[in-house]
From Swiss-Prot:
Keywords: Periplasm, Signal. GO terms for molecular function: carbohydrate binding. InterPro entries: Bact_Solute-Bind_Prot2 (IPR050555), LsrB (IPR030159), Peripla_BP_I (IPR028082), SBP_2_dom (IPR025997). Belongs to the bacterial solute-binding protein 2 family. Coiled coil: none annotated. It comes from the Bacteria. It comes from Salmonella typhi. NCBIfam families: PRK15408.1 (NF011937). Residues 1-26 form the signal peptide. Part of the ABC transporter complex LsrABCD involved in autoinducer 2 (AI-2) import. Binds AI-2 and delivers it to the LsrC and LsrD permeases. It is found in: Periplasm. One of its GO terms (cellular component) is ATP-binding cassette (ABC) transporter complex. This is Autoinducer 2-binding protein LsrB. Gene3D superfamilies: 3.40.50.2300.
Length: 340
């Protein structure tokens, strides 16, 4: 009888240990949130995140609001926290609107990261950053300058919204560079498409009609750039320089037809992968302070940089920026090498 009891205890203990291991494994769930679903740029980032999850044995859920709103993202964050997710990675539609929800999540032990578009740094641990505002603002102006070869020119800025963190930081730097290096360029308007394809096309056509002598549209937004290109084709404006940021799959026909000579971006699939690998490092309690590096299969080494790289004044332990290794300028010679 005693021997039978000992066996039962041993079996129950083993079952308990196995259950504990299974619980830990099941708890390693990461939510990857875009500004909104249905946009190729964000879908590609989500694909990269889920590929990394499969490689690491982590369940990565990709979900976002159907339109870019703070309330939509907050609802998703709260839902994922209540479902017991261990980490949330979000492309924030507002630098501060998500902060109360994200801080509550961190207080409950959830790891919070941002990708593509940041919050205030105190509202997350790490920002997986495609490039500093200075890098990306300069990139926009340089692409325009390759085509606008005159001292006096008229330029329009066109992107998603006046409140989104990342694009406004880039545009601020781009406008500063224009002021310093191209003082003869007049910025005639700054307008927004609000991440809506139909509204973006209408806005782009309105800009072109309102400024018939416009020389360039700078559109650092995945919806605004193709909308500007389509508007130029619709209105037969062949001599208009159109530059900005979007995905190669969306922009390929405009490049092939010569409407867009060049545009830029970064490997957003890679950005999704890096985000999940960094989140996994946090879940495994690996060292991730400023100066620490992480080797990512197929990508290489990424390093934690201080928040000051993004122009912030907030620094703390376990907090910083992870920059993508490189950015890409696409043109007719290289665009077919990319598929995202």
């Amino acid at each position: 009888m005693a021997r039978h009891s000992i066996k039962m205890i041993a079996l129950l203990t083993a079952f308990g240990l196995a259950s504990a291991v299974m619980t830990v494994q099941a708890a390693e769930r990461i939510a990857f949130i875009p500004k909104l679903v249905g946009v190729g740029f964000f879908t590609s980032g989500g694909n990269g995140a889920q590929e990394a999850g499969k490689a690491l044995g982590i369940d990565v859920t990709y979900d976002g609001p159907t339109e870019p709103s703070v309330s939509g993202q907050v609802q998703l964050v709260n839902n994922f926290v209540n479902q017991g997710y261990d980490a949330i990675i979000v492309s924030a539609v507002s630098p501060d609107g998500l902060c109360p929800a994200l801080k509550r999540a961190m207080q409950r032990g959830v790891k919070i990261l941002t990708w593509d578009s940041d919050t205030k740094p105190e509202c997350r641990s790490y920002y997986i950053n495609q490039g500093t505002p200075k890098q990306l603002g300069s990139m926009l102006v340089e692409m325009a300058a390759h085509q606008v070869d005159k001292e006096k020119a008229k330029v329009a800025f066109f992107y998603s919204s006046p409140t989104v963190t990342d694009q406004n930081q880039w545009v601020k730097e781009a406008k500063a560079k224009i002021s310093q290096e191209h003082p003869g360029w007049e910025i005639v308007t700054t307008q927004f498409g609000y991440n809506d394809a139909t509204k973006s096309l209408q806005t782009a056509e309105g800009i072109i009609k309102a400024y018939p002598d416009l020389d360039a549209i700078i559109a650092p937004d995945a919806n605004a750039l193709p909308a500007a290109a389509q508007a130029a084709e619709n209105l037969k404006r062949n001599n208009l320089a159109i530059v900005g940021f979007s995905t190669p799959n969306v922009m390929r026909p405009y490049v092939q037809r010569g409407t867009v000579k060049e545009f830029g971006l970064w490997d957003v699939v890679q950005q999704g992968k890096i985000s999940v690998y960094v989140a996994n490092a946090l879940l495994k309690n690996m060292p991730m302070n400023v100066g620490d590096s992480l080797d990512i299969p197929g990508i290489g080494k990424v390093t934690v940089s201080p928040n000051s790289e993004q122009g912030y004044h907030y620094e703390a332990k376990g907090n910083g920026i992870v920059l993508l290794p490189e950015r890409v300028i696409f043109n007719k010679d290289n665009i077919d090498k990319y598929d995202f």
